[in-house]
Amino acid sequence: MFDHVQNDHYLPELDCETLASGRTYVTPEGNKYPSITTVLGELSKAGIEAWKKRVGEETANKISAQASTRGTAVHELAENYLNNKEDWSKGYMPANIFTFNTIKPVLESRVNNIWAQEVPLYSDKLEIAGRVDCIAELDGELTIIDFKTSRKPKKKEWIENYFLQGAFYAAAFFEQTG
């Protein structure tokens, strides 16, 4: 059973617009900021295009669609589980439950005191916004948690964007909450 922390920090919901250039969030002051995933996607565009050429457009589209579906399902399973839903896995494909079960022991043994899940964060300094998966204590320390799925293990140098995304969420959270 996970504890959910009542905190004094208000994180406002943001309107979201999907444009041809990517997702944009509108802050309470009316500022429009690109999402962190849109910004990071621009940085990795060349690598993605090279991969598509290597495997072929049809294969790349198939892999991308499968990855997106799997990622969404595992993310929803994690959210349900952290929200202490009794039927957290009902209606999900066995393969997605299997994938979630690889992170379940880490959640059970190291995560608690959940501050927020699926909340928007933005930075007026960086002029970027995004939606963080979870803010909770990991081993007793308040931490940004972003769930990622992959078919294969990845080297650190391949996932620099993950670290940049997490660093952005931490900076935006600090900016909004002090």
Where are these regions (language model features)?
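Metal-dependent nuclease catalytic cores that hydrolyze phosphodiester bonds in DNA/RNA
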Residues: 1-129
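Mg2+/Mn2+-dependent nuclease catalytic core
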Residues: 115-178
